[in-house]
Amino acid sequence: MGVFLMKAVHFGAGNIGRGFIGELLFESGFETTFIDVVQPIIDYINASHSYEMYVIDNNYEKKVIKNVKAVSSITDEPAAVEAICEADIITTSVCVDNLDKIAPTLAKGLKERLNRGGSKVNVMACENAFYATDMLKKALVENKKAPITEAELDEIGAFPNVAVDRIALCKVVDGVKIPQIQSTFELVIEKDKMVDSTAQPIKGAEYVENLGMYLERKLYVFNCGHAATAYFGYYNNRATIFDALEVPEIKADVIAVMKESAMAMTKKYPFTFEELEAYIEKIIKRISLEELHDEVVRVGRSPIRKLNAKDRLVGPALLAEQYGLDNSHLAKAIAAGYAFDCKDDEQAVEIQNYIAENGIEKAVEKYSSLTAEHALYQKVIDAYKALKA
């Protein structure tokens, strides 16, 4: 391994860890230590201090990521602590539900780093959630196994939030999951919270002051369009997102949904409609790859969460209403969400049972917090009844 490489620590050697963040760290000149709990993946990485990944939309081109090693936080925590002490950057991709599980090891490492008089380090949670680094910091303070105070954390670390976006799948080869990723991605970092706000340690990332607008753009445009495709596709008996977007009417409806959302975003934030249109075009291209085999029931799953007033469909529809803009296609997508009756989805079953007992009006009130005083309320109900007619 190169002697002069900067050192990175990354928690989580899954699809996003190896296929996204790990690749960027390698391209940025870091030697990366992955901290994980899955022994076969740890052994696989350590066998050659490298790993393979494939780029889906480039004829599955193979890439080999080098200068890597892996340690188990279960069987070799001292090595994990040592790596944290020496790291020039620390990142995670373990899923937000697991941040409290990695907190003790990370807290122990940061505390030891502080005791040794180490330099301040950027710690970033690259998770698919709003303000995940804030959640990680909270988990560090609240963990009981390796106590560390917020003041100590601020002395030894900087905690910028990030927005992540990349489609990362995998295939199993000899019992190990090998990442298969799309070439396009977004990694947006809150620069004013970094140790040095002028530094750009990760190549290919964007460094911005107002992260909130980028997080909301992802939820209200990308996730919005993805969910709309799933619900329209399911209603029309299409198996995958690719199949759904092959139907011209569905594709037109999905683009109309995203444009309504985008128009509302231009009123709230300094985005131009043209740049959001380009973003929509990029998204449609990304999600309509046949090779993804992305099932509509997967993308549409957990409709209680997705039909919440602050989430991907009702959120932008209410924003459009607030600015007096058209949201009729968004209302139709919300209605399709209420018609999503997948038997294998607990939340879908709950919604369907509730509609059967109480009617769509009460369901929209309960799950989307919409009432008759919202113009959107009646639009959703009318659209739902039209779907059911």
State each model region's role:
Residues 1-5:
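Short, Lys/Arg-enriched N-terminal segments with co-localized hydrophobic residues
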Residues 6-11, 15-389:
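Substrate/ligand-engaging "lid" and interaction regions
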